[in-house]
A protein has these predicted regions:
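N-terminal intrinsically disordered, cationic/polar leader segments
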Residues: 1-33, 43, 47-110
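A short mixed-secondary-structure module that forms the rim of ligand-binding clefts
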Residues: 35-38
Length: 110
């Protein structure tokens, strides 16, 4: 099971992903594809955050991408970045809706 937590607090954002879909059923091509989709979404968010930092619009708190874990946290007032990340995060929601045995999402806002 892969768990995704998406937090929003003021100008701060955090996306925390833990787990592996493929480990649930190591022989499942479906689990492998879902895990690959999760990885692609996380890497896309990270790249958008890095691009926004390069323009001076975002302060990165942490970007860690490794097997079974992703942490992406940042502070920004860049509406374009926030819109892009919100759109990408809809991909996590869609994966949870279609593959609840592999993905669990939680959203927190303060």
């Amino acid at each position: 099971m892969t768990r995704v937590r998406i937090d929003k607090a003021g100008l701060g954002r955090g996306i925390y992903i833990t787990g592996h879909c493929a480990n649930e059923n190591s022989g499942s091509a479906e689990a492998t594809l879902v895990c690959a989709a999760m990885t692609t979404l996380a890497q896309t968010i990270a790249q958008n955050v890095f691009d926004s930092e390069d323009t001076g619009d975002t302060d990165i708190i942490d970007v860690t991408l490794r097997s079974g874990q992703a942490v992406i946290s940042y502070v920004t007032d860049d509406d374009g970045l926030n819109t892009a990340v919100d759109g990408i995060c809809k991909g996590f929601d869609m994966l949870e809706e279609n593959y609840p045995e592999y993905v669990s999402c939680y959203r927190g806002e303060r």
